[in-house]
């Protein structure tokens, strides 16, 4: 007996030692990643917002990919000198694989030469100055350049809005001057006349009469059919108010710095003043994919705040380092080379889209989207100009120009993308059929669009197995067309039954165009006009409403459709994406009926099994027969429960309850065999005492195990 105890202790100690080694190994396997943000001073709030995004991303990557990233956090106060000092501090750490951070371009420019000299790959989050990427081969920016933004603003202004006579206002700092110079150069080539130029100092407050002094003649001011403002958000806000006060009602176009909640705050600026104000943007939550939806939801849940638009880029920067490591690039040079090798065909799919860098300046190759400040939000404009990447687009240039799919400006081609707003309100869930992996629902569906080239009848529900729609109302005479339907049908869905019956199920309806891909049509969810009240009619009545969610995204079919142009180049298949819009309602299963219908019968079977302990240990045959009957009862009951559910390749929460029951009954059978051998050895009294002890322990232990299981699964299901 002593030898067995010593052996048991030795085995247990060995297991603990192995676990400790594994744990220590994981710690040593963690990759250290520098994160430099303004965590104090004027930009502290934004810096902490971005830091939370980086932490969330690192946690998700560790959970999903098993890659441990230890964030080494530093504060640069968004100041160039402090950024340089912090960069030197990080550069002295040989364990660091890379750096993410710096908010303004000025701070990034202060740190970039240090990173390049130390050969540390650095991803700057919001640096739009092209000189950041040109600082050296180890420095990249997650943003597009000021030059690209200004040129795309000019392209939209002349081709989409048909404006030719412009008032330009810019700040005198590098941000304003690079935007100004690039816009002026592009405007000159596009035939846009800059009727007047104004400049203001970035340092210090903007004079309250800046516009009134510079443009005193209200009558003369009516010559401008557009105003372009190249300034930071605080000055931009004041300039917009002063322009409106001076009677200038022309459209105003601002850079991405205007993506500030201040422009949506009626305490700071009226809705009348922001009418016809358009803003450039590298990313929009309204157009975000499912990753963006989950990130935004997790960010709100964990911080109680709305993520800053640059928080998405910060999260993507962490993802890019993880992607490099996942592909075997585990040192600085390999990671840098991986970043430099990325292109459209091999891009990393992130929250903000496909991630890859320009070769000439190592700035992120992003589209510049245009939004309108309307209804208290940055609303996607009905027309977007995007740059093509696929070879087949250039090959079919002449044909596509003739059809209006492309426009050519300044010897460059742009894709003309029509935006369609899609809204959907559920009013009845008729059935949730887990076995068929489908649900039946009724809802109102509507579309809003401007282009005559769009036929909304060709926008279909992608996951519908059977669906019908009846026209309710329409208005095709206005500039913004509108059509609404009442829909009813059955929709395919891949239910997640891992936590059944503690589960929540999302019931999505996904829409996409039948034939036009994302280079022609972009779907955006019309969340402004959707209802988010609970769905009252849900059948069968074992579900309760949780929430309603929506996202936009891209769906790629793994097919060339037989088009030879999609196979240009050896071994390459064009990435043909279709824009999709998804609206889903989340339901939670009511657990109370399952306590009586599922778990109570199982507990009754186990309770009856406990009474076997009341049978004298000498009556082995009777005890064994009853034990086998209990085992068969649990097995049949388990199979009966499973027959009502679909076949899946993983264990459900319900299965664990039956596993505990099997262990309980099998333990009892094993004890009966043990008791028989003891009785044959004429140790009846000692065996009966052990039997009585087990009778007192078994059922309370089972109840305790089931309680712990229930609490665990209920907690997991909530998160």
Each model region followed by its residue ranges:
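Extracytoplasmic "Venus flytrap"
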Residues: 34-55, 74-80, 172-176, 306-312
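Beta-alpha junction/loop-to-helix N-cap segments that form part of ligand/metal-binding clefts
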Residues: 45-50, 60-133, 200-205
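Extracellular/periplasmic Venus flytrap/periplasmic-binding protein
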Residues: 129-131, 137-245, 286-290, 294
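Extracellular/periplasmic periplasmic-binding protein-like sensory domains
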Residues: 190, 240-315, 329
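Segments of small-molecule ligand-sensing domains
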Residues: 298-311, 322-378
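Soluble non-transmembrane domains of integral membrane proteins
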Residues: 344-346, 352-365, 372-379, 384-582
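Channel- or pocket-lining gating/hinge segments that regulate access to a cavity or pore
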Residues: 582-701
